[in-house]
Amino acid sequence: MEELHEARKDDRTEFQRDYDRLIFSAPFRRLQNKTQVFPLPGSVFVHNRLTHSLEVSCVGRSLGNDVASQLLKKHPALADSHISEIGSIVSAACLAHDLGNPPFGHSGEKAISTYFSEGQGMALKKELSPMEWDDLTHFEGNANALRILTHQFEGRRKGGFVMTYSTLASIVKYPFSSQLAGKKSKFGFFLSEEADYQKIAGELGIIRLSKPDEPLRSARHPLV
């Protein structure tokens, strides 16, 4: 991840830039080709992942602003903090919450997992560590979202989207690795991003629930 970038001179906060950066990104625009519900014939309105994410983001911003307002009324001393940015952080996290979902949603996750556990992908098992293999055989869209946002892909600068740690932590609904996924196969980060998540959690003071010699499990960020 890129930890710092040159200071900007516009009036947007870093959290507002997170939202804007997502809106104009190719991964977010591709959500328009992924259905949120099974498509129906005729004139029935069908949501795709893009419209769903925009709607969720609007609701998240409103709820976040309400929470910030109530906190400031109860704790006026927080006025000089970033508490007023809760709405911006939550709206950006909502915007990104489906970013890692494959086509066909949970069925797509199952198809990817099955390719490695039962299909031709089994040939790769000997090339991977047990933890890497768990990531592939329990493919998870939430973990893939964090990968998209933090990973350096070809042609993109180091740090991926270069988002704030608060926004990144707010999309991690399941703050543990695939080793702890259980039957529901839910987890928050792949092995390739575990060190990044540890860095984020450490900087934000997120409590680690597991022992040092156990697979990583953390508390959730309060804005998840």
Where are these regions (language model features)?
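Membrane-entry segments of alpha-helical transmembrane domains in multi-pass membrane proteins
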Residues: V46-L50
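Sequence-structural signature of the catalytic-core scaffold of metal-dependent phosphohydrolases
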Residues: M1-D11, I23-K34, S43, L54, ...
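Short hinge/gating elements
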Residues: P39-F45
